[in-house]
Amino acid sequence: MVDKCLFKLSDQFPEHTAGFHVDLGLKPYGSYNSSKWSPVRFNRVLTNVGNGYDQKTGVFTAPFSGLYIFHLHFIGGLHKQKTELAIFAGGEAMAVAYADGYDVDTNDQGACTAVVDLVMGEKASVKIYFGNPLLWASNLVSFSGVLIHSD
């Protein structure tokens, strides 16, 4: 009876786990400049289960095939210019976040989420999609991803 219960319980958890959470660091002021179409290299890695995120390149490589969820949050719109960042996966923009600084202050927030089916070895990253490449360089700019179901 105990063996049956343990077997059923083990079926409830995925065989593979992978996830990461990265940001642009703890420095409260300053800016991060990235060229358009180049991955943003998040310099502080808070979590990297499965070692899929490469801090040197800013690219996540899927360690397992399956369904992933990615989330991006950023402060942009510096100097009253709009900024668009995109979550790229499998070679295309899956979600785009927008921020501008046209309101009272000169900063704005953008966020987006993408649910993507990746094959082991496929890549995901954040890239400047349009506009001003300056980002607020702090822990307020973050990117994360989690394997929610493995194939």
Regions found by a protein language model. Give the residues of each.
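Extracellular jelly-roll beta-sandwich "head" domains, especially the C-terminal globular C1q domain
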Residues: 1-151
